[in-house]
UniProtKB/Swiss-Prot annotation:
GO biological process terms on file: flavonoid biosynthetic process
Disruption phenotype: Lack of flavanoid pigment accumulation in the seed coat endothelium (transparent testa phenotype).
Motif Nuclear localization signal per record, residues: 221-224, 264-267
Organism: Arabidopsis thaliana (Mouse-ear cress)
Phylogenetic lineage: Eukaryota, Viridiplantae, Streptophyta, Embryophyta, Tracheophyta
Gene giving rise to this polypeptide: TT1
Name the record gives this protein: Protein TRANSPARENT TESTA 1
């Protein structure tokens, strides 16, 4: 009896078992192996930032030099953190700004940023910026305004502004277009006095900056400068012309209270009356003398 063909056996077995239990026959094993190898070769390389640099590969040929460089960078970062900002700005006409214009200092725990020749003033006005001008700068003041294009100087800022208009239309777009030529921004910076021992000196334990450059000029003239004005009545020397006029006007006058106290200045008498209240007031004779002096002045004007 002849054996049945193989395909009949497979057909009968396929009817008994479901098809998904069959294992697919690999008719070309060598070809499949080659395709897997090709697929592995075609895969893209990993990104550089995902490479593990802590592996056993020695990527640094000179490790000692690298460690020294890292230590130096860390020391520089620590020094930058310790020192921050002081301010010492020069006048626009006193020399050209240099590349090393900014200098860092630290005094008595106060951080200051120093600037030379007024460089970088426009960008550093915000925050706690201030100025410590030299005596020559205080006495001379802003008498020369310099053009940053041709370095021509002018005695007035308005003349400098008109001169800048001649350099091009880019300087005619309002005050913002003239940045770098305006010394008015410097005038508003708080200032410290440069005289040691002064209460407004930066090293004084109770130091306090003056409001602006003009206030510093008046302070320096009154406290540390030459006093050319002399009172013709008492001979007192004064440094500021306005103070001299006020002093001479009130020199020799005494403002008397009814309680018997007398004062040099009228405002002192007013403060006295305001502090003690009832029972105090200006002495009537002083008022009569003031009225008599006013009437004599009016008579001299009309006759």
């Amino acid at each position: 009896m002849e054996s049945p063909p193989l395909y009949e056996i497979s057909s009968s077995s396929s009817s008994e078992k479901p098809r998904h239990h069959f294992q697919s026959l690999d008719l070309f094993p060598n070809l499949n192996q080659n395709s897997c190898i090709n697929n592995t070769l075609i895969e893209p390389l990993p990104l550089i930032d995902r490479i593990n640099l802590n592996s056993n590969l020695d990527l640094n040929p000179n490790p000692l030099y690298a460690e020294e460089g890292e230590q130096e960078e860390e020391e520089e970062e620590e020094e930058d953190r310790e020192v921050d900002v002081d301010l010492h700005i020069g006048l626009p006409g006193f020399g050209k700004p240099s590349n090393d214009a900014k200098q860092l200092k630290k005094r008595n725990g106060k951080e200051i940023a120093t600037y030379d020749a007024g460089k970088g003033i426009e960008n550093e006005l915000s925050g706690k910026a201030y100025w410590i001008p030299a005596p020559e700068q205080i006495l001379i003041g802003f008498t020369h305004f310099s053009c940053h294009v041709c370095f021509k100087t002018f005695n007035r800022y308005n003349n400098l502004q008109m001169h800048m208009w001649g350099h091009g239309s880019q300087y005619r777009k309002g005050p913002e277009s003239l940045k770098g030529t305006q010394p008015r921004a410097m005038l508003g910076i708080p200032c410290y006095c440069c005289v040691e021992g002064c209460r407004n000196h930066i090293d004084h334990p109770r130091s306090k900056p003056l409001k602006d450059f003009r206030t510093l000029q008046t302070h320096y003239k009154r406290k540390h400068g030459h006093k050319p004005f002399s009172c013709r009545l008492c001979g007192k020397l004064l440094a500021v012309k306005g103070d001299w006029r006020t002093h001479e006007k009130n020199c020799g006058k005494r403002w008397v209270c009814v309680c018997g106290s007398d004062f040099k200045h009228k405002r002192s008498l007013k403060d006295h009356v305001k502090a003690f209240g009832s029972g105090h007031g200006p002495y009537p004779t002083g008022l009569f003398e003031e009225q008599a002096s006013n009437s004599s002045v009016s008579e001299t004007l009309f006759f």
